[in-house]
Amino acid sequence: MNKKVTKTLTYYKELAPLYRMIEQAKVIEALVHLGTLLTPDNEDLQAATNRTYIENNWLTNENYALSITHWSATLSKDNLQKFVLPYPYTDTPQRVGVIMAGNIPLVGFHDLLCVLLSGHHAVIKPSSDDKYVMLYIVKVL
């Protein structure tokens, strides 16, 4: 290899960890923003939960409110940074398929969260029973 190529590769290897940190920080920032929008007072979110309840009355607004409140509190910068600390952010992102369950409100969100925080690209198939809220979340992200 010539000197220029070697120097470029060395430079890339030195910057790669910084690039990964920046990318992961952007994902965390987007998730923190989502957490601020996950409130029972959010009209778009209310519309999505109401529409879901019309199609599947097992997923009540009260159960959604519990789940939304939980995720809103969980999606803080500090919590997310602690969560990802022991796990590497990938150098080679892959497409990861996620087929989401729909028996509990937002049960598939944890899977989406893990895929995004690891640096991969999520290809999701929301549950037909819980699709409107998940589609809202994906739209926000």
Labelled PLM ranges:
Residues M1-R95:
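N-terminal Rossmann-like NAD(P)+-binding subdomain of aldehyde/semialdehyde dehydrogenases
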Residues L80-L141:
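Conserved small-residue-rich beta-alpha loop and adjacent elements
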